[in-house]
């Protein structure tokens, strides 16, 4: 035991002495300062070999054996600050043109990169790593301090100078060595940005010298920002292999920087800091006041212990003088002393915090803020689109230079720069308004500067990455992706309010693509529900995403009442398996088309989006728990975050009427603490009033609900299940009706596989036998045999009766009931589609219209005994030798779903139900749209659902769009939709066959039309001569009478003429002359009939007139071209004289005829 104590007391050798000796000898041989000139560094005789040996030691010892001994020895020997940096200075001042010195400078750069490489905590760390880790962190901070601030020496510019020759070489001529030099230069810049003092270790020197502000100022002063801008803007042309390194540099530069503070001027930033300091002082004073209430006095420094007698006669011991104040303080002290040793789940070990800590703020001074803002603005103008487009493509194809952490960096950096772009626009607008200029004079740039992350490819990549991260529970990646998605939504929202019409249209398109996918809606909901202690950063990101997504989706669904979403889980896709080519007739082709149309119709019916139904999905206990966990940080939350939580609870309690979800003891206690304390919210904040009113209303509703449902007192202790929610809300259990299975879809045999009844029966029996249901086929055969015997007996009886009574009519055969032999057969008669098809093929019929289990099936009276025997014989043959087909001809695959004709007609007439919300709908088109829209095909369904935003007039001032403006825009879009629907010519009336020509069919058609005209002309002449009107004429007269009464007057005729096609005006001009003559002659005949006929009824007079009016067009069509002998009848003067002579005769208003495809279309034939 004494030996162990002695061994423990001895000094532990942290590094092998031999290794230390070798490394020290190499550092000494490298060079040093001359005694004569202490400021001048002198290289050793073999300095280049020493540098290469040191690099070899780092690679072969530290990296190979996973140790840090060589790095520790180099840090103790002060290699970087004592040798490498002076060598850089020597090369910069004297040896830039020397090839030897350039090689030495490059060797120093090769050493600096591994020595400054970020130290990461990972699962493979050894004891040696943990031993050297703190020291190396201190050493790297000293390296960074020497590189950033070393008097007037610009080491960063020196490093850039080393890589300039390689940058000047064109990419096609660049060698591997040039790419390596560029990579070393960028990696060193990345390392300098990443290195930061460890907060857990004592600071060595001034922390400001190595802070983020010092790094940014040094980058600005030594042209590092200019280098980054140059490479980012040309990343696709000259620096395609350096895109990922540039992304890492940008990520570590902007990580944790507050965008809003960055784009403030000095006065605003100073005021912001003053407000923050004032808030902190108020919090401190509040804590002091709380403490002063229970602080011990100078005479009360003795211990205090009291017993608290509880309601159950038990006694608890509480210590401390603060319990003497009152009973409430005593009970609170008891609650604070309670501890629940909740089992903590095993935390997943996080490899590194360099790329994870998004929430830790980075404080910048005014100079650094100004320099970084200038760089960010220039980067947005020139380098944003090239860099992020190239990086996204590299991430998608998983290039060799890409590591998994780069995806997280990509999404976070995109989110940060999108937020910066919106902040820059807001700052430009604010400065413009401060100068007193109207908004219309502000020349705003479009959002094309950030268009590379708003395209469809980026959205697809983002959605796929979010789903992968969520499935693999990679919460840090999901955190960055949620931030990116939120910033894209906010950017699109700002684009909708842009003054540029192009931005508005792009925003409309992006929203349509985002909200069209129902998987996106489900993913946002699932992220909210799956929060389980992932940290405040993740909690902030997921609550912000759900808040923004819900608000934008609600606004978009109100603006687009016909919004539809695509649900891939519900879509019924057609089986696209290749089939053997076989000749199909026209009926089969039409059946296939009908199947496609019916499939598209089913999908469209499932795409209708209901926002209330979607918002109700967020009304569950898991989502409430997520926002409750977020609200527990109310003392650290800002106004926007508090408003976010307030809006969610308001939506739950009042919009969705689900306030029961909030009736839980811990939630109510949290609300009460936020308002009444201890540690309540600051009452001077504007959001405090809104929270106070919300809490008051929630508690008031809870008290009313307790009066109605006393069981709620018990339920306050627990989370609410769905059944409990329904009972507490409505006072009774949910009435659940037993689910009734519907009858299966009706099947049929594919017409290309079988045409005769025998073949169809063979296929169906083969399918049933392959399914193991031969007993059902045997049952059908037995039923047919029994029915044949019974039918044969009845026929013999009828023959005997007819022989006895000569001439007696034959009575119809009675129907024979089809009875199942057991309950399983009874169920199969309803649920087995193949059996139902077989029963239909053999001639069985179902009685009644209701198709339910146990419905009666009968053998109809039309089937004789011979027919039944023949069918039974066919079934027996198929059952003895069932048709099984082969691999390519499976009888089960020869069956398909049967569609009813009315389904096809309904499918053709289906259109989108657009509710315009106005009683004036259809004023321009009284009977609604003339044609329904074409059915959507699967290929263009997403594109057809896009609605193009109407161009808006530029407004004078840019202000937040109010509800009245949004309502006016919605009405304008509705009017535009109505006008567009009135002009639609549907596929229902326009087919490709209209363009084809068939001379024989045309000849037959024209002959038939000529025959109809002659028959119609004969009926007209008969009616004019005899005054007798047949039934056909009367029907036409009634239609003509209604048409005459509804279209009397010149103005009505003109409006009706305007609704007709304007393309027929030229053709109709020549027909007016013929129409005038026809009217004159018909009026003359009517006058003669009135003179020669005795007094008749008014109805007969009307018939006479309506005959002339209704048939005058056909009469003129049957006549030959007008002869000169009848010219006087067509003169306007004669027509006027006839009208003057017969003043009592009604005068018909001339109407222009409508022509379509060369034929007269009467208005009644529409």
Curated annotation (Swiss-Prot):
InterPro entries: Timeless (IPR044998), Timeless_N (IPR006906). Involved in chromosome segregation during meiosis and DNA damage repair. Belongs to the timeless family. Keywords: Cell cycle, DNA damage, DNA repair, DNA replication inhibitor, Meiosis, Nucleus. One of its GO terms (cellular component) is replication fork protection complex. The keyword Nucleus applies. The lineage of its organism: Eukaryota, Fungi, Dikarya, Ascomycota, Pezizomycotina. One of its GO terms (biological process) is replication fork arrest. It is found in: Nucleus. PANTHER family: PROTEIN TIMELESS HOMOLOG (PTHR22940:SF4), TIMEOUT/TIMELESS-2 (PTHR22940). Residues 881-893, 966-981, 1109-1142 have a biased composition (Basic and acidic residues). GO terms for molecular function: DNA binding. Residues 333-358, 564-594, 881-981, 1023-1145 are annotated as: Disordered. This is Topoisomerase 1-associated factor 1. The keyword Hydrolase does not apply. Pfam families: TIMELESS (PF04821). Residues 585-594, 916-926, 1087-1107 have a biased composition (Acidic residues). The gene is tof1.
